[in-house]
Design a protein with these regions (language model features):
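Conserved G1/Walker A P-loop phosphate-binding module
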Residues: 2-49
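Inter-motif core of Ras-like GTPase G domains
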Residues: 86-107
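Conserved catalytic network of the ASCE P-loop NTPase/AAA+ motor domain
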Residues: 8, 52-55, 65-70, 90-95, ...
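Conserved nucleotide-binding/hydrolysis micro-motifs of P-loop NTPases
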Residues: 22, 82, 106-108, 142-146, ...
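Short, well-ordered amphipathic alpha-helices
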Residues: 1-2, 32, 59-63, 117-125
């Protein structure tokens, strides 16, 4: 849920990148940190394990200027994708205004993607979020690799709500900014309705 500070005229929103381990969530944030104007982005904070997998979260603060006289700030988080970090994912997901679900497009990762997607849906339900009204974006990552599933298959198994979806190659930035832009715009539209 967005934090609104009336005294400072600030709105802080939270976007969470969610998906299986090594699907490209942290790579998205690294690309954005390099691509965004330095005056609009803060320092990236990562808590990694020795294998460079995210242990708790990555955080990237992003300022977008003013809307209706309020300074808009987005905090971009990733969750650890490894199965044993479910409680951490739940903690990071709390208060999210938008989720970008990053799916690994490799055929060998379909079942893991489905399990992660099902877990996300369950957690959103437990948080009383209506998936039909909640800002959600699907990102089909690693489109540059061999043995990837057609987008139509990913859509069939993972995009049952027909939310916006993007093909991406996070290591090169393909689709990363477009995906975030839709997440931000969806979040701002929802804020205007509240």
């Amino acid at each position: 849920m967005s934090l609104i500070n009336m005294a400072k005229r600030e709105i802080n929103c939270k976007i969470v990148y969610y998906g299986i381990g090594l699907c490209g969530k942290t790579t998205n944030l690294h690309y954005l940190h390099q691509a965004v104007n330095p005056k609009d982005v803060g320092d990236m904070v990562s808590i990694d394990t020795e294998t460079e997998r995210t242990l708790y979260f990555d955080l990237l603060p992003l300022e977008l200027g003013k809307v209706h006289g309020f300074q808009i700030r987005f905090q971009l988080y990733t969750v650890p994708g490894q199965v044993l970090y479910q409680q951490t994912r739940i903690s990071v997901l709390k208060g999210a205004d938008c989720v970008i679900f990053v799916a690994d497009s490799q055929a060998s990762k379909l079942q893991e993607n489905i399990e992660s997607w099902n877990e996300l849906q369950e957690q959103l339900r437990r948080m009383n979020k209506d998936i039909n009204d909640f800002p959600l974006v699907m990102q089909w990552n690693k489109r540059d690799l061999q043995d990837i599933l057609p987008v139509s298959v990913l859509e069939q198994y993972l995009n049952l709500y027909h939310v916006p979806s993007f093909e991406s190659v996070a290591v090169t930035g393909k689709g990363v900014i477009e995906c975030l832009r839709v997440g931000i715009n969806s979040t701002l539209r929802r804020l205007e309705r509240i």
